[in-house]
C-alpha cells in the first residue's frame, strides 16, 4: 500500500526503508519518502516472501539471517488487509501477451510491470493518491493476460488474470 502527495520536479527527497516484523516466511517492511524539511511525501507498506531460490519455494527465514536485521517500529498508518477482494461484476478488457521487456532476472513478470499494466486502464485525469497491489502468481514470457476492471467514483480495481480468470495480480488505485 502506498499514499502520496504531489512532488515538484527537482525537489530534494530522502527515501527510507526498514523491516518491522518477520512471521514464518513473510517479511514486513515500511518505506517513506521525505522532502528536504523531513515532511512525509509518500509512505508504503510491503509484505515479502523469503524464498529458497534453489527449490523455488517459500522458506522460513533463519535465526542467523534474522540477527542481521535491525527491527524498527512500524510506520503509523492504516494497514490494509493483505488480500484484495474482487467485486462480482468486472468489465473484461482485451487480452494481451507478456513481452520480453516485462520479464525480470527471475524469468517472470517484474512486480512493477503489473502496476504499469493496470495503470493503462485508468482515465487520463485520474490522480492516484493511494495504490495497493496483491501478487498472486507469476506470469512468464508468452503468457496471455486477461484484464478485468471495476470502477466507481473514487477507485479503480484491475485484475490481471490468466485464461481461467485466476489473477496474476490485483491492483487497486484510489483518488
What are these regions (language model features)?
Residues 90, 94-174:
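Acidic/His-leaning functional-site neighborhoods
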Amino acid at each position: 500500500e502506498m499514499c502520496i502527495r504531489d512532488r515538484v520536479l527537482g525537489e530534494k527527497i530522502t527515501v527510507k526503508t526498514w523491516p518491522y516484523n518477520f512471521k514464518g516466511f513473510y517479511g514486513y517492511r515500511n518505506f517513506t519518502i521525505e522532502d528536504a524539511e523531513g515532511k512525509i511525501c509518500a509512505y508504503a507498506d510491503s509484505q515479502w516472501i523469503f524464498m529458497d531460490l534453489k527449490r523455488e519455494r517459500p522458506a522460513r527465514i533463519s535465526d542467523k539471517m534474522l540477527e542481521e536485521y535491525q527491527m524498527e517500529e512500524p510506520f503509523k498508518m492504516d494497514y490494509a488487509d493483505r488480500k484484495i477482494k474482487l467485486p462480482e461484476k468486472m468489465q473484461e478488457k482485451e487480452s494481451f501477451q507478456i513481452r520480453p521487456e516485462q520479464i525480470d532476472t527471475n524469468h517472470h513478470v517484474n512486480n512493477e510491470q503489473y502496476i504499469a499494466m493496470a495503470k493503462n486502464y485508468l482515465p487520463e485525469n485520474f490522480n492516484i493518491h493511494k495504490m495497493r497491489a496483491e501478487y498472486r502468481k507469476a506470469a512468464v514470457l508468452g503468457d496471455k493476460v486477461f484484464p478485468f476492471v471495476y470502477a466507481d467514483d473514487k477507485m479503480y480495481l484491475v485484475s490481471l488474470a490468466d485464461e481461467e480468470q485466476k489473477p496474476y495480480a490485483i491492483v487497486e488505485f484510489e483518488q
